């Protein structure tokens, strides 16, 4: 133990901690090079990191130059054609093995490689040096030490940018190596370049993935991600966030060009001991210029990143601060961020796009807290935001508005434009709907050119050219008249009525929402978003479905924009803003609940036929085939969340999370019954108010409402099949009847195809008999054929499989 303590103590003081020490030492980290004096010719070096096993069979191992007295990088490279290494990984769950197989073709990662660039703040360096001593073959190679850095130093420098802030933080904070991270970039094998990461900050610490370029865009494909073995067995603990922010007070100044200058104050609560570097997330479009802690300036660190995994696709920057003395865990401090930039774009037509809606202020996680927001903006504009409007004043070309939250919320946002507004009262609640006076440039109709005759030039033709296939009279194209642009304000009252109806429907069934006032406001584009008390709805949701451009869309898209999407985003006032999730693997719950809530409202508004038509469309989208002939639903289990989006299945994340998510809830409703299902939703809202809900929490809560005689009382089989696995079966029923009334023996077989033999489900059949009677029976099906018997009083006249449409399946007569 003593050597480790000595190393940790040395880390605390090896970096100079004078004014500006953070950026100075970040530069030292950025300048780390491979150490020519620490290059070894190696054979059979074994390194185990959690579930990952590395075998450096033959090649060179060269360490990076030490920083703060500690080695944080190393490179293995195969120097000869017969050299190489091997990485082996056996994911612990069926779901992750399926995911790995989807990308690599095998459920186990067993890849030979030529190079491995390693970065770490754990005990990897010590483990490698210990392994070197076990075989006399492993010797220093000065010649290779002189040769390798020239080629590999630029690569290491580039990759270090992704982890430099973590290296600095761990080094100066003197953390136990058990809480350190590990990352490796592997290349030279059949799978191309890929990354492995062990990040103690995450619930799923082990991650393997690859950056892919396809169809003119990047995808980060996470092959597998899971809890590390030592974390699962209690030998290592998940690392806490170093601090959290509470009670935001944000003052924003918008100039005439809508550039922002912001001062964001918050209560700063340190959590971990001996921490001198703290990281926050902020939009890439904003530049942090100054930070004060308890009124004193602290150093700002604008860094490249904090982890290797998915860094290239991160939409936000990781910014840090370096403090001279570590604050005491549990103490309270005031922090003040000064930053500026541009997150608002001009979409044309007096319409503005507010980007970076979740990162326009510094964050560390999404905890429920209070917000006080003040905006100063051009007087000709209107601005809405989360929270209750406290006051608005105007003068000298500037308008100022203050908003304050009355209940804790997770996210604060704003929107602006030139609005016309209407208000609806829903009991004690207020629904305000804003519409832009015009539409964005992309929705304005293009002018159609007119063809007109031009005056002849020179002498007239004496005879027609026999080779011309058009009149010899010259023509020219001139700009014709533009059709009038759509007017969002014409349907403002209709949008307000619909919004109020949906809001009232949800209040009556789910209970109190996140805030007492809700504002629906327009945003360019095709998608929306639901913040606490603030709904972003696309301009398309305001337009007449019988006029261009909506008139030219399929009927299902017109319904989506004008009814479903607004209802979905309003439902997020409950699902996401009262009840939330903390892990990405549970994020599907919020989208599925919002999607199905919109379907419940549509069912109440337009009847069950409208709901079933949409469920059929959702099923068809899940069954659509990609270029390899695979259905979208097969991309992975719904709990993979954002990981479902890949180059093979670009649409899979949305289709599975939203559409299959709605089907999962619809099937659950079929099991519980209508009353119990609605009671479940209300129970979740009440029991998880301002708390995080996990998938397993949801299963346990739903199990409380399962009928007593249900064969899967804890819903474990249901969740194992529909939530944690994939598959949509094709079902059919074969049957025959023997005997005479009043004792007719009915024998049936439920046939299940296009799914694995292990696929299990509960499917209902309805057996009709004369005179006009029927028996509704659930069948527990597994495998290709499941036999069932029923004794009837009368002969069957027909059998209907899943008559209430409560099973996600293709049904054959």
Residue ranges and their predicted role:
Residues 233-238, 319-322, 328-329, 338-376, ...:
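Glycine/proline-rich low-complexity spacer/linker segments in large multi-domain proteins
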Residues 171, 180, 185-241, 281, ...:
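Non-catalytic accessory/interaction domains
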Residues 317-321, 333, 784-790:
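Short strand-edge motifs at loop-to-beta-strand transitions and within beta-strands
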Residues 275-305, 368-370, 376-380, 766-775, ...:
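Solvent-exposed beta-hairpin/edge-strand motifs
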Residues 19-261, 363-365, 716-721, 729:
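N-terminal, polar/Ser/Thr-rich
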Residues 228-232, 236-265, 269-275, 281-285, ...:
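Hydrophobic helix-coil surface modules that form long, contiguous segments used
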Residues 18, 294, 403, 449-749:
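Hydrophobic alpha-helical and helix-loop surface patches within well-folded domains
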Residues 3-16:
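Bacterial N-terminal signal peptides
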